[in-house]
């Protein structure tokens, strides 16, 4: 069984690996990227570094294989990333705004995100200001670890939050719905399913 514990600075490489290996709608996205760390620089590392009180990992005998990361105030987190996180990455990754969207690779889409991070839609933040990201490697899936991580994290924000799930990832949507998350209909692009808990 996995142990749930607070994230530590030395977990950062594991967070990057997990983020990459779940980046293809829950499956291993390694083949989709030239830079294996770029996606983690968006969806994992900033939370571990800027919001350590809201970062937890699941660790088994083979190491860290899951995480839940987030922020209690989405707008404050977006502002902090703009001030403290994105500037350094913008020096490392060139803006790809000049590449037509239909031609962009995964790396180019993520570089575009770094330069033009989309704010969470206001109706989502109004429903629940906190947000999270949760990912588990296959060896921890279906064993109650996701629920344990969710329980631990939601307790840190008073049990109210939102998340965005890829519409092409029905397995994740089923997990959230079983836990008690509800869909917010008619918000944002159809490629993302916005969900809230406790709202």
Language model features: what each stretch is:
Residues 74-75, 164, 177-196:
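Conserved catalytic-core motifs of GNAT/GCN5-like acyltransferases
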Residues 128-130, 157-167:
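Conserved GNAT acetyl-CoA-binding A-motif
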Residues 23-43, 79-94, 98:
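Conserved GNAT-fold acetyl-CoA-binding loop/helix
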Residues 32-55, 61:
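Active-site rim helix/loop that mediates acceptor-substrate recognition in acyltransferases
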Residues 125-127, 134-151, 167-174, 178:
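Conserved glycine-rich acetyl-CoA-binding loop
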Residues 57, 63-72:
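Conserved beta-strand in the GNAT
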Residues 3-17:
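A short beta-loop-alpha structural element at the N-terminal edge
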Residues 75-133:
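Conserved acyl-donor/pantetheine-binding loop and adjacent beta-alpha core of acyl/acetyltransferases
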């Amino acid at each position: 069984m996995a142990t749930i514990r607070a994230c530590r600075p030395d977990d950062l490489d594991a967070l990057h690996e997990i983020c990459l290996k779940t980046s293809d709608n829950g499956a291993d996205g390694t083949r989709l990227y030239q830079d294996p760390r770029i996606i983690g620089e968006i969806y994992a590392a900033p939370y571990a570094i800027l919001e350590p009180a809201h970062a937890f990992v699941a660790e088994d005998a083979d190491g860290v294989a899951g995480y839940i990361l987030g922020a209690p105030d989405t707008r404050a987190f977006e502002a902090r990333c703009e001030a403290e996180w994105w500037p350094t990455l913008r020096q490392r990754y060139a803006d790809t705004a000049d590449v037509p969207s239909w031609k962009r690779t995964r790396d180019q889409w993520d570089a575009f995100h770094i330069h033009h991070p989309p704010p969470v839609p206001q109706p989502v933040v109004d429903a629940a200001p906190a947000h999270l990201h949760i990912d588990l490697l296959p060896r921890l899936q279906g064993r109650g670890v996701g629920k344990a991580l969710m329980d631990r994290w939601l307790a840190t924000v008073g049990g109210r939050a939102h998340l965005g799930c890829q519409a092409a990832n029905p397995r994740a949507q089923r997990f959230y719905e079983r836990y008690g998350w509800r869909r917010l209909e008619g918000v944002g692009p159809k490629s993302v399913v916005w969900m809230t808990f406790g709202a």
